[in-house]
């Protein structure tokens, strides 16, 4: 996140080499980058640059996700020493402690000219197939270089039947239940409670009464393994 911000702020076009060393590695998972450090380093040395989109959230940049609501706080609130010791499990345990604090957030979104408004339990504007290592989007509907975000909004289920329906829709990646809104868009304008915090690539971002989120098409180049069939 900081590297991308630095490059774009400087107007540089330097290819980025990425070694996944985090607890969840959503970004690497979506790009199918090796999680083995030596293999990742080899990809940087022997690979080739491939162009990818990034997001701009107001005045900040993000590589793969801007999210709000349930369980998003755990990504930045979990102490680093706990992440180091427990890895992805640390996020799960932290998420459990958040259960009593979960609430709906009233949000209005203008998505490429269409308006969506309601009380949402969770929302994500992403360019990734994996969010938090728990929620996985359909790879067939996610292209990290097509100039579009995937937007997923989850309304709070009101009974056990709706909970089951919502979980089933997320697991099947069909997104066809009443609690879910799934769209693709290049630009989103958001109106929300300015006290509602956001998470950008796992880092805390203060709330905004109004903020515009824009997909920057092919804004970065990332080193990837060469296509041997090309």
Label every model-predicted segment:
Residues 25, 129-131, 196:
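Glycine-rich nucleotide phosphate-binding loop and flanking beta-alpha elements
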Residues 1-125:
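Catalytic core of DAGKc-family lipid kinases
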Residues 67, 71, 124-140, 204:
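Glycine-rich phosphate/pyrophosphate-binding beta-alpha loops
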């Amino acid at each position: 996140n900081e590297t991308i911000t630095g490059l774009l702020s400087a107007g540089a076009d330097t290819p980025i080499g990425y070694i996944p060393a985090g607890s969840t590695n959503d970004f690497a998972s979506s790009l199918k980058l090796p999680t083995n450090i030596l293999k990742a380093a080899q990809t940087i040395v022997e690979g080739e640059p491939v162009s990818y989109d990034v997001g701009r959230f107001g005045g900040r940049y993000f590589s793969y996700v801007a999210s709000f609501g349930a369980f998003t706080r755990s990504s930045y609130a979990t102490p680093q020493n706990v992440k180091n010791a427990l890895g992805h499990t640390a996020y799960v345990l932290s998420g459990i402690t958040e259960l009593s604090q979960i609430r709906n957030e009233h949000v209005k979104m203008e998505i490429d000219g269409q308006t969506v408004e309601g009380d949402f339990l969770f929302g994500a504007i992403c360019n990734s197939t994996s969010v938090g290592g728990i929620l996985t989007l359909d790879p067939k509907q996610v292209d990290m270089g097509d100039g579009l975000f995937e937007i997923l909004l989850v309304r709070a289920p009101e009974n056990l039947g709706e909970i089951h329906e919502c979980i089933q829709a997320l697991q099947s990646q069909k997104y066809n239940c009443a609690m879910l809104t799934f769209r693709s868009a290049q630009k989103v304008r958001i109106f929300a409670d300015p006290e509602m915090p956001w998470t950008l690539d796992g880092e805390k971002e203060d709330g905004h009464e109004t903020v515009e989120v824009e997909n920057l098409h092919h804004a970065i180049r990332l080193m990837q393994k060469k296509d041997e069939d090309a």
